[in-house]
Amino acid sequence: QDHICTNVHVQTKERISYDGHDKLPRSLLHGLQWLLYGSGPAAAVIVEGGGFFHGDDKTRPDLQIHVAPATVVRGGQTQIPGFGFTINSTFLRPRSRGSVRLRSSSPVDEPLVDPNYLDDPHDRKMAIKSVRIIREVLSQPSISPLIAEERLPGPSAETDDEIMAYIRQYGCCDYHPVGTCKMGVDDLAVVDPELRVRGIENLRVIDSSIMPVLT
């Protein structure tokens, strides 16, 4: 399993974001400011805020958002001009499960990794709901006066199908993979509750691959 990240990108009326600050000469000045004083944009993280929401589970939050004061499309893989900020959302407990399979009998061949994002209908429902919640946040009077327009998915994406088409094109990995080496006591468990690999002495696995599911 892994979290898939859905984003809403907006253009601001004024240049109040980090967009363009990664280019010379600004990036050089920011680097010097950090090196000499330990301050400035280079001393900050790209995610400046966040929060949790109840999407479907009323007992505990199941959606998480992050606010980045820059236009970060597909984890930075896609560049669009202008300036603004990004709010991304993640459904915390996805039901879709992927797979990791051997490509061949050769240990040097990379494995076949299929995260199988959005395979479960509930995951698709929550991804769409997260975009609608972000839009609701952006419509609040404390923030809406700063916004010139929604750039992605854009005002034309209104129906569930239109929003899902955007998510499938622009959704990105949240880098939280788990479950390829699960911990447990059943026959399919790779490690026991002490993180010891079953059937092999003096070998433990201690990274997030031991988590059976995302929680």
What do these predicted ranges mean?
Residues Q1-P81, E136-S142, E158-D161, A165-Q169, ...:
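Mid-to-C-terminal "cap/lid" subdomains and adjacent gly/pro-rich loops that border
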Residues S144-P155:
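Short, glycine/acidic-rich hinge or "gate" loops at secondary-structure transitions
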Residues Q1-I16, D56, F85-P145, M164-T215:
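C-terminal structured subdomain/cap of oxidoreductase catalytic cores
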Residues P121, G154-A157:
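Charge-dense, low-complexity intrinsically disordered segments
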